[in-house]
């Protein structure tokens, strides 16, 4: 009888398990929606590198490229900086 009532009324899930399931779904959607080859931190890293390098050499944001490449089971962070001919 109890199983019949739970079938009709539905078993109440614990709040924590419901929240966990929802979070897993949200994370899965976010991972699928973004470019897997470019982590979220790359644009911020590029801006910070430009700011630091600009203290010593005059460069623009276009002079610096940051890219993350996956090779087999390794991740390689590649930073290319086009330096001017003369230093300040």
Swiss-Prot record:
Keywords: Cell cycle, Cell division. The keyword NADP does not apply. GO terms for biological process: cell division; regulation of division septum assembly. It comes from the Bacteria. It holds the Pfam family MinE. The keyword Nucleus does not apply. Prevents the cell division inhibition by proteins MinC and MinD at internal division sites while permitting inhibition at polar sites. This ensures cell division at the proper site by restricting the formation of a division septum at the midpoint of the long axis of the cell. Belongs to the MinE family. This is Cell division topological specificity factor. The gene is minE.
